[in-house]
Amino acid sequence: MLMTAAGTITPARVFVVGAGVAGLMAISTARRMGAVVSAFDVRPSVRQEVESVGGKFVEIPLEVEKAEDAGGYARAQEERVYLRQRELMARVVAESDVVICTALVPGRPAPLLISGDMVARMPSGSVIVDLAAEQGGNCESTVPGQTVEAHGATVIGPVNLASSVPHSASQMYARNISTFLLHLVEEGKIHLDPKDPITQETLLTREGEVVNPRIREASARIPGGTAAGRSA
């Protein structure tokens, strides 16, 4: 909301799709700027996190058996689930001035959650920021690496966002890598514990075998891949 001598301007309506780290940051930033913020995530468990940073969690009833994996990340869903999600999100998107897309599935292309028809129903001059553009985008109108006009809306598809803040990105990357390596060291030597959740998620091959489920699954989709388990 903006108050001026000429009157009061109503706040912008912001809808955030995906409530991971980027989504929660987008919610809190938009709230600090005075926007009315709503958000949705296929994982109902994040509702409290959305509300804790000032967003309103949008209830969208979906028949999803397993919305998240053991690490808390969203799982890939069948196309019928995404189709139903688009149908139920259409009204919320149509009422929004800004939509920020952050929905990603580890190891998979970004799910398509906003169709061109949904963009066309948004108010003229609306803005869509698709943070999933590098993985294909959550919005059908997104062009990775470009800002385009679609159905009267501006669609921004940034890629390699870390390069826009190289100093801070380098600091965070170095800190995370050093913390990860120290986690693997025990008494001055590298120690790989197969029961450790971090090791399970990051270990790709061991003793000539592909042990990471995501890599095995990705290999199965490539002709001549190593789905059988042997590493190249």
Positions of PLM-derived features:
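Short, ordered loop/turn segments at secondary-structure junctions
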Residues: 42-44, 62-63, 104-105, 132-136, ...
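Glycine-rich phosphate/diphosphate-binding loop of Rossmann-like nucleotide-binding domains
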Residues: 1-92
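Adenosine-phosphate binding glycine-rich loop
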Residues: 2, 11, 139-230
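Short, solvent-exposed amphipathic alpha-helical segments in soluble enzyme
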Residues: 31-33, 53-56, 114-121, 143-147, ...
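Catalytic cores of large soluble enzymes that bind and process phosphate-bearing ligands
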Residues: 42, 77, 81, 88, ...
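ADP-ribose/adenylate-binding Rossmann-like module
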Residues: 98-156
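Structural motif
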Residues: 13-15, 35-38, 55-57, 97-99, ...
